[in-house]
Swiss-Prot record:
Gene: flgI
Keyword Transmembrane helix listed: no
Primary localization class, coarse: periplasm
GO biological process per UniProt: bacterial-type flagellum-dependent cell motility
GO molecular function, one term: structural molecule activity
Keyword flag Signal: yes
Key words of the record: Bacterial flagellum, Periplasm, Signal
Superkingdom: Bacteria
Protein family: Belongs to the FlgI family.
Cellular component terms (Gene Ontology): bacterial-type flagellum basal body, distal rod, P ring; outer membrane-bounded periplasmic space
Signal peptide from the UniProt entry: 1-15
Known partners and oligomeric status: The basal body constitutes a major portion of the flagellar organelle and consists of four rings (L,P,S, and M) mounted on a central rod.
UniProt function note: Assembles around the rod to form the L-ring and probably protects the motor/basal body from shearing forces during rotation.
Protein's name in the database: Flagellar P-ring protein
Length: 362
């Protein structure tokens, strides 16, 4: 019966796997951060006279090896050392000995971390405990080059890099995965329709009352107490395919780049729109006034300005009841509206109450 239910769920028109639209409460990654030194740079490290914390960190490291820096050497210039921040994501269920990728970023005035080596750096969580140790050679995608005449070229970002598998996990994060007789599924996008369909799908497959919707974004599911059975149980649930509810109609506008995204369910109530362009041009054409001979006059520059205003007439187009996305785009393209004009039209439609969607400007 269980196999038949899974096979029937796979033939949904727009079905998505449960693992793609929801996550298990408490099963998540944790952010780690650390502070360390990158050495071995080819003269592109921090200018330690301007970043004293780099030199202080370097001296502290030497003292751990029993090396004492003589007094009065605070102005030493180290060109191959850079102070960096190290960040990583500790995956859920990560165990000691496993490797995780890390990102290394300069926090001083280093020009490039290319060719550098990160020295042993502890990575801490928000609770202050050390969960991983990082060290290794950096992989930097960008580079920086400068000529003697001051000409300079920079490709990508040379002041940051990554170390694949550069951190070793030293401590695992406690998880409540095996606690209690139930699990909570959190939807990536809250939707009452999607939550109801998930509950119905699970209950149809496993029996009434197994799944209960807490709200539009969370679902409580009864789970076995045995850890092994719980893993098998979730492997079935996460591959269950559900038809998610349609998203709320939205129009997203990026005012900086001119990008406009119109959702599938966006419609317009009856409205008539016209959009014209007014261009004002001001030109300066000064003339020189030259007095006649023996007139005791002085040469003067007389300003002369010309102001010209041109307005490009645009035809009016009409939206009927329930106009769809395709009709909106077709009508706007017919009048040759630029992205900036389309933004103004959509904002005006929203103010008029004709745009049946959320207008979001980012």
């Amino acid at each position: 019966m269980l196999a038949a239910a899974l096979m029937s769920a796979a033939f949904g028109a727009h079905a998505e796997r449960l693992k793609d639209i929801a996550s298990i409460s408490g099963v998540r990654s944790n952010q780690l951060i650390g502070y360390g030194l990158v050495v071995g740079l080819n003269g592109t490290g921090d200018q330690t006279t301007q970043t004293p914390f780099t030199l202080q960190t370097f001296n502290n490291m030497l003292s751990q090896f029993g090396i004492k820096v003589p007094p009065g050497s605070g102005n030493v210039q180290l060109k191959n050392v850079a102070a960096v921040s190290v960040s990583a994501d500790l995956p859920a269920f990560a165990k000691p000995g496993q490797q995780v990728d890390i990102t290394v970023s300069s926090i001083g005035n280093s020009k490039s971390l290319r060719g550098g080596t990160l020295l042993l750096t502890p990575l801490k969580g928000i609770d202050g405990n050390v969960y991983a140790i990082a060290q290794g050679n950096l992989v930097v995608g960008g580079f920086d080059a400068e000529g003697r005449d001051g000409s300079k070229i920079t490709v990508n970002v040379p002041s940051a890099g990554r170390i694949p598998g550069g951190a070793s996990v030293e401590r695992s994060v406690p998880s409540g995965f095996n606690q209690g007789n139930s699990l909570t599924l959190n939807l990536n996008r809250s939707d009452f329709t999607t939550a109801k369909r998930i509950v119905d799908k699970i209950n149809d497959m496993l029996g009434p009352g197994v799944a209960q919707a807490i709200d539009g974004g969370s679902i409580r599911v009864t789970a076995p107490l045995d850890p092994s059975q719980r893993v098998d149980y979730l492997s079935i649930l996460e591959n269950l395919e559900v038809d998610p509810g349609q998203a709320v109609a939205k129009v997203i506008i990026n005012s900086r780049t001119g990008t406009i995204v119109i959702g599938q369910n966006v419609k317009v109530s009856p409205a008539a729109v016209t959009h014209g362009s007014l261009t004002v041009t001001i030109t300066e054409d000064p003339i020189v006034s030259q007095p006649g001979p023996l007139s005791n006059g002085q040469t003067a520059v007389v300003p002369r300005s010309r102001v010209n205003a041109e307005q490009e007439a645009k035809p009016m187009f009409k939206f009927g009841p329930g106009t769809t996305l395709d009709e909106i785009v077709r009508a706007v393209n017919q009048v040759g509206a630029a992205p900036g004009d389309l933004m103004a039209i959509l904002e005006a439609l929203k103010q008029a109450g004709a745009l049946q969607a959320d207008l979001i400007v980012i």
